[in-house]
Amino acid sequence: MSQFTVHRNQHPSTKSRFPLLLDVQTDFLNGLATRVVIPLMPQAASKSQKMDKLTPVVQVDGKRYIALTPQLSGIAKKELGPVVADLAAHRVDFINALDFLLTGI
């Protein structure tokens, strides 16, 4: 598992709304059975979810997705789907979004 990799969401009840999950957990905690993820929603499906600093927009396979940072959650590693992208190039955007969510700064 690597921080800032994007996985397919395999959960039957959420995968249609949030097809991708962004792993934001540090690699130093790979020994845990869980990973912290941010759901990615297709930008076209979102009406009012966009807040520039809190919900950065990224592109995966030619499609734009909104990172729904306020919906941060934990998931068992075994439930993560295959890796489809690496968004480490957007690291600063995700760290800033998490910082804003947790500290308001």
Locate the predicted segments by residue.
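A generic "functional-site adjacency" signal
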Residues: 1, 15, 88-92
